A protein has these predicted regions:
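Non-catalytic, polymerase-adjacent accessory regions of viral genome-replication enzymes
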Residues: 1-62
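Hydrophobic alpha-helical scaffolding
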Residues: 10, 23, 100, 128, ...
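Generic recognition of stable, solvent-exposed alpha-helical segments in well-folded globular domains
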Residues: 12-15, 19, 28, 32, ...
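Reverse-transcriptase-like RNA-dependent polymerase core
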Residues: 31-37, 69-92, 101, 105-114, ...
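Short, conserved non-catalytic motifs in the polymerase core
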Residues: 41-56, 78-105, 121-134, 157-158
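Conserved catalytic palm subdomain of right-hand nucleotidyl-transferase polymerases, strongest
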Residues: 44-52, 97-98, 136-169
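Short helix-interrupting loop/turn segments at helix-coil junctions
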Residues: 114-120
Length: 169
């Protein structure tokens, strides 16, 4: 289905996708999303509800059905994230928000729906949080541009936005 979504988005950039919510409520789609979340090494990190993936798997069928029903009834509400702080190399602490397992599964299901559609709209020069792209790809591209024939640059600007994610509301 993701390949179809991607193909439709590429073939018709003006296409309106009108029934994506039914995918989100699809049991198989939620099961695949759960498998993706389960493959993450943070699967045993609990959110504010104190449930881990092991807890979720203890009643997998019931939990998937419960999630599906709340999504279908449009009564699903994400929980607050659990805030933890991890040490950074400079000695400061970096805040992390840990979603519940339910929220992670729904977020992954949404990513699985939206990513193939939006990918065709993104710039080929965008590397952050993109499938099959990494910081190494971005560095390689920049290196090739800086050393390639016919290209001359007068400036290279390096930047870092301090505590950027802390300022997003």
């Amino acid at each position: 289905m993701q390949k179809k979504l991607s193909r439709w988005a590429e073939e018709d950039p003006a296409k309106r996708f009108t029934d994506l919510y039914s995918l989100l409520c699809n049991e198989t789609w939620l099961r695949v999303a759960q498998l993706h979340v389960n493959a993450n090494r943070g699967r045993e990190t609990a959110g504010v509800d104190r449930r881990t993936m092991s807890n979720f798997l203890g009643n997998l069928d019931g939990n998937i059905e419960r999630l599906r029903e709340t999504l279908k009834a449009k009564t699903f509400e994400p929980m607050p994230v659990r805030r933890v702080y991890i040490p950074k190399a400079n000695g400061k602490l970096r805040p992390l928000g840990i979603p519940t397992i339910d929220d992670r599964i729904v977020q992954e299901a949404l990513r699985m729906i939206l990513e193939p559609i939006w990918e065709s709209d993104f710039s080929i020069h965008s590397y952050g949080f993109r499938p099959n792209r990494s910081t190494y790809d971005a560095i390689s591209y920049i290196g090739n541009r800086l050393t390639g024939k016919g290209w001359t640059f007068q400036w290279v600007i390096e930047g870092d936005i301090t505590s950027y994610f802390d300022t997003i509301r």
